[in-house]
């Protein structure tokens, strides 16, 4: 989303509404129940190769018979618990390192490893997949599954394909269980993820592409990662997600020839295909997002920071906490809460200009 033409406002006008929603905000309008309000969604499609990865595909990413078992901490156990384990009980997870050469295309090897681990990964024994430090190409969509921990510290993954496609999603099909039951217990830790809009052949044609698109899920963590060079859309987009944490991440860079729409780095959304709002996950049951912690991130030289510019009549986004983040040189707005309930934005620092200014201030 974020592709609907709108009147460009001055930075001074936008800064006055940072972190708040005006009743007369031109991005929104009231709609009947079960309808949505949204800027037109970018036309985003999974590449066929990413959506149809099969079990038998050849790859260098192999699961060893002697995959290392590790004990995870009580904190990690809580993150992976489905609530059925006795309190304080620790579990184990298998750690598997992706076999890949520096400079290789990571798409097929990692997707095949995800599929190999899909049935094996459980609430009791989740799987940790390590991407070795190095530089890798990405030419399609990565499809991750429940009970997986993707560790990418020291790895740089750069999109090199000329088409517009998701960088990462849960599952390799749009169909899943509804509400928050589709996927669970997913952690993405580290890595530099370069969306590299420069490589896209038709940047100025309608639509951009979302980076990580997460829907119908519970217990999702994205931490310590760097996201670069967004094209007319979102680095991270969530729809119908409960219990999510985005911490310690950096977001930088966008296509500056395009200055319309939302383009939030972190978009909090609802599951509906009305106006192409969030079409990547079925069913379109109107599930919103609840219990988010967005803390300690840096947003630098981006179009918009965090928030929501679509909603379903009669439904709210609940318990969204945006704290201790730094926003520097944001074109449109840092934070937008739309139809939020029991939510907080505090102790965020907004540096409104590239050089020190009396207008630089903290938002509490």
Locate predicted features.
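Right-handed parallel beta-helix/beta-solenoid
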Residues: 69-111
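N-terminal extracellular ligand-recognition/capping segment immediately after the signal peptide
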Residues: 101-111, 125-165, 171-173, 193, ...
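Parallel beta-helix/beta-solenoid
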Residues: 145-147, 152, 183, 188, ...
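Conserved small/polar residues in nucleotide/adenosyl-binding loops
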Residues: 353-360
């Amino acid at each position: 989303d974020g592709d609907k033409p709108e009147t460009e406002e001055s930075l001074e006008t936008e800064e006055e509404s940072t972190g708040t929603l005006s009743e007369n905000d031109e991005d929104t309008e009231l709609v009947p129940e079960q309808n949505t309000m949204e800027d037109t969604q970018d036309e985003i499609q999974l590449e066929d190769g990413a959506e149809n990865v099969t079990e038998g595909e050849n790859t260098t990413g192999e699961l060893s018979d002697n995959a290392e078992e590790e004990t995870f901490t009580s904190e990690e156990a809580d993150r992976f618990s489905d609530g059925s384990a006795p309190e304080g009980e620790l579990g184990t997870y298998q750690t598997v390192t992706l076999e890949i050469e520096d400079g290789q295309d990571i798409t097929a090897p990692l997707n095949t490893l995800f599929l190999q681990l899909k049935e094996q990964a459980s609430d009791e024994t989740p799987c940790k997949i390590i991407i070795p430090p190095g530089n890798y190409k990405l030419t399609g969509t990565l499809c991750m599954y429940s009970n997986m921990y993707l560790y990418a510290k020291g790895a740089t993954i750069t999109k090199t394909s000329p088409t517009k496609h998701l960088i990462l999603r849960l599952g390799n099909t749009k169909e899943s269980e509804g509400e928050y039951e589709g996927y669970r217990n997913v952690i993405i830790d580290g890595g530099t993820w370069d969306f590299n809009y420069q490589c896209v052949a038709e940047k100025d044609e309608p639509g951009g592409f979302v980076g990580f698109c997460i829907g119908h899920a519970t217990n999702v963590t994205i931490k310590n990662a760097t996201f670069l060079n967004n094209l007319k859309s979102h680095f991270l987009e969530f729809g119908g997600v409960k219990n999510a944490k985005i911490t310690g991440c950096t977001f930088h860079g966008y296509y500056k020839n395009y200055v319309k729409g939302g383009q939030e780095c972190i978009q909090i959304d609802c599951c509906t295909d009305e106006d192409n709002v969030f079409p990547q996950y079925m069913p379109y049951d109107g599930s919103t997002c609840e219990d988010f912690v967005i803390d300690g991130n840096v947003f630098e030289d981006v179009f918009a920071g965090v928030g929501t510019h679509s909603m379903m009549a009669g439904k709210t986004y609940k318990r969204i906490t945006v704290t201790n983040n730094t926003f520097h040189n944001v074109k449109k707005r840092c934070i937008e809460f739309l139809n939020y309930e029991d939510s907080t934005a505090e102790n965020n620092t907004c540096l409104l200009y590239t050089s020190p200014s009396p207008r630089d201030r903290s938002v509490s």
